């Protein structure tokens, strides 16, 4: 089945009962299938607007998982995040920047993940959500598989 919820709660609900591949920009997912049929196991989170945002929260910036590299390049971030914008401008081609997502770059676990070094240097943390709880994890621990 192909699911495309418009809110995070519905997406988390579906993940509780089905084993699904999570998709958004698909810049890694589609090439990884090597033209194989993906089957009926896709959760497309690209329609969840709350995941495609850049928000100011107390003393940090919250960048949603489906935020694209182009979104970051065009955003009005403080000067201390200029490095992130410059790194975003170096990710792949313009086509990848327009569809590739921050969350996909981190979750794919590729050794060539363009965004990881910059986000690590900014001491980034990630938010992991399930129906039961929300965890905040330092990116360095997430990368290690902690």
Question: Which functions belong to the PLM regions below?
Answer:
Residues 1-146:
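C-terminal structural segment of proteins
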